[in-house]
């Protein structure tokens, strides 16, 4: 392992010990916010420190085995050789574990998200596909124990959605769904197609982490136009005769958000503002990402496949994720919400890239 990584691990071990002392300090205990913050940091450092302690113990055992190899007794030397072989394998395993533990965590991974699906090219068939995608994510959320609340929806003429925005609430939602942003393409014979021809349609999916108060972008109320209207469409069980639904337009950017899920205008406004915050923050992050991507592109050339991240081919029962050249003939299972076979490889690919960067430092 590189000396720079060893130094980093020693620094983290010192910090872990320091926090351990602070957590028993009465001043810290009485400050609930600080105590909670330090407790969280302590819990994050613990697996790294425990693994590093095992690594250090293993290093000492390797030193002892190497010393034993110098013994005159051939039996002792043979024992030392066998032990050294096992310890070297263990060292490699521990190094891999430590590198994985040192990979920077995405600060948004534990957040709830706003899921936005928009029908793209393909007219009515695209809207039907948007409905299929929404059901796929809703079923996936159900298997994970997450909750899905529709914030706003505009239904298609023949079913599905022209646009649907939902809030997905649960543990580690963003960590799993963050790979879903992009264009999703479907190839199938539409119900309305009499000639049996395969049509291609597309939808765009956006996954936006919900914003904490700390991260919020300052919004000038004078730059907002707020309209009220009667709730309709999805969430119709809450429809009433008052204009409880809210539409907010952020005038400088033209971003428009709606919420018609809650019974009261006040709650709808609060939810719409939360969605607006997430959209504006996502736009700001996207701008930063584009700037970074432009710099990278100038160095390594274009490899961007974000225009079309995944294809769902119904005649062949095939799902292809174009970012990692993954092809699965499990379309029925995937569209029914079994997304782990798709998301798992994407997570592993990201970890492999991060590990390669870490090893190259």
Swiss-Prot record:
This is Peptide chain release factor 1. It comes from Coxiella burnetii (strain RSA 493 / Nine Mile phase I). Its main location: cytoplasm. One of its GO terms (cellular component) is cytoplasm. The gene is prfA. Methylated by PrmC. Methylation increases the termination efficiency of RF1. The modification N5-methylglutamine is found at residue 237. PROSITE patterns: RF_PROK_I. Coiled coil: none annotated. Belongs to the prokaryotic/mitochondrial release factor family. It comes from the Bacteria. It is found in: Cytoplasm.
């Amino acid at each position: 392992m590189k000396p720079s990584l060893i130094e980093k691990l020693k620094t983290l071990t010192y910090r872990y010990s320091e926090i351990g002392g602070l957590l028993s300090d009465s001043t810290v205990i009485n400050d609930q916010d600080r105590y909670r913050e330090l407790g969280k940091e302590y819990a994050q450092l613990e697996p790294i420190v425990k693994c590093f302690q095992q690594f250090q113990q293993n290093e000492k055992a390797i030193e002892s085995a190497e010393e034993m190899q110098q013994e005159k007794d051939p039996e002792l030397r043979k024992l030392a050789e066998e032990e050294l072989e096992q310890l070297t394998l263990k060292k490699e395993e521990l190094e891999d574990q430590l590198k994985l533990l040192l990979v920077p965590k995405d600060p948004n991974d534990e957040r709830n998200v706003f899921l936005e699906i928009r029908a793209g090219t393909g007219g009515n068939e695209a809207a039907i596909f948007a409905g299929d995608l929404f059901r796929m994510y809703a079923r996936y959320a159900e298997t994970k124990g997450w909750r899905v609340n529709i914030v706003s929806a505009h239904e298609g003429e023949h079913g599905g959605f022209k646009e649907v925005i939902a809030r997905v609430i649960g543990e580690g939602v963003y960590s799993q769904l963050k790979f879903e942003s992009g264009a999703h393409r479907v190839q199938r014979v539409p119900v309305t197609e009499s000639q049996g021809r395969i049509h291609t349609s597309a939808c765009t999916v956006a996954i936006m982490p919900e914003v904490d108060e700390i991260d919020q972008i300052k919004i000038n109320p004078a730059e907002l136009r707020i309209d009220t209207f009667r709730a309709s469409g999805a969430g119709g069980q809450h429809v009433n005769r008052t204009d409880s639904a809210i539409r907010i337009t952020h005038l400088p950017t033209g971003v428009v958000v709606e919420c018609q899920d809650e019974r009261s205008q006040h709650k709808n406004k609060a939810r719409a503002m939360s969605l607006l915050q997430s959209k504006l923050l996502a736009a700001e992050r996207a701008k930063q990402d584009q700037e970074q991507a432009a710099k990278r592109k100038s160095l390594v050339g274009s490899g961007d496949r974000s225009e079309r991240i995944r294809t769902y081919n119904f005649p062949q029962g095939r799902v292809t994720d174009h970012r990692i050249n993954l092809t699965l003939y499990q379309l029925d299972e995937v569209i029914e919400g079994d997304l782990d076979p798709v998301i798992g490889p994407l997570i592993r690919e990201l970890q492999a890239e991060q590990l390669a960067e870490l090893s190259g430092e």
